[in-house]
């Protein structure tokens, strides 16, 4: 009984953040593990500024950060979010594929609920929120990463941050 109730609470807690107003309602299939839920709570509380989330391969780290970015972009109109990885080419081959899986699982339709511009590396949602795909590699000409200063990001997630 407790396990079933706990699973329901985990699903409901996450569902609250995706309140996109669309003609065919998005469907929430994300049921976080206990570890993912703990990280989700830190990501969505009003106190924590930075969250480091690690673990073994196939632990759902990339999935969690993609789900968080999609949920926040959908829930908060006209906000800007960042999704980074050391090399943009690697991000496109890995994390971006996970992001598209999350968008599909949430029944968000390309061209209707969001648009992906591969030229500018920006995903724009119908509510005017955006996710910038970022190359986070160290550049000797920009040792303090000031190139990100003008983006006015609401939040950012870096996949495989140990590479950066």
Language model region names:
Residues 2-164:
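Phosphate/NTP-binding elements of NTP-utilizing enzymes
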């Amino acid at each position: 009984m407790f396990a079933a109730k706990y699973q329901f609470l985990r699903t409901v807690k996450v569902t609250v953040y995706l309140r996109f107003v669309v003609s065919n309602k998005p469907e929430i299939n994300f049921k976080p593990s206990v570890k993912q839920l703990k990280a989700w709570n830190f990501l969505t509380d009003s106190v924590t500024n930075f969250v480091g989330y690690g673990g073994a391969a196939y632990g759902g780290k990339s999935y969690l950060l993609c789900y968080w970015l999609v949920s926040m972009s959908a829930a908060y109109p006209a906000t800007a979010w960042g999704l980074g990885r050391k090399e943009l080419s690697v991000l496109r081959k890995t994390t971006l594929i996970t992001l598209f899986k999350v968008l599909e699982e949430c029944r968000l339709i390309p061209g209707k609920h969001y648009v992906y511009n591969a030229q500018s590396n920006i995903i724009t949602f119908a509510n005017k929120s955006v996710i910038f795909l970022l190359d986070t590699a160290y550049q000797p000409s920009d040792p303090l990463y000031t190139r990100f200063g003008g983006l006015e990001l609401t939040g950012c997630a870096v996949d495989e941050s140990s590479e950066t």
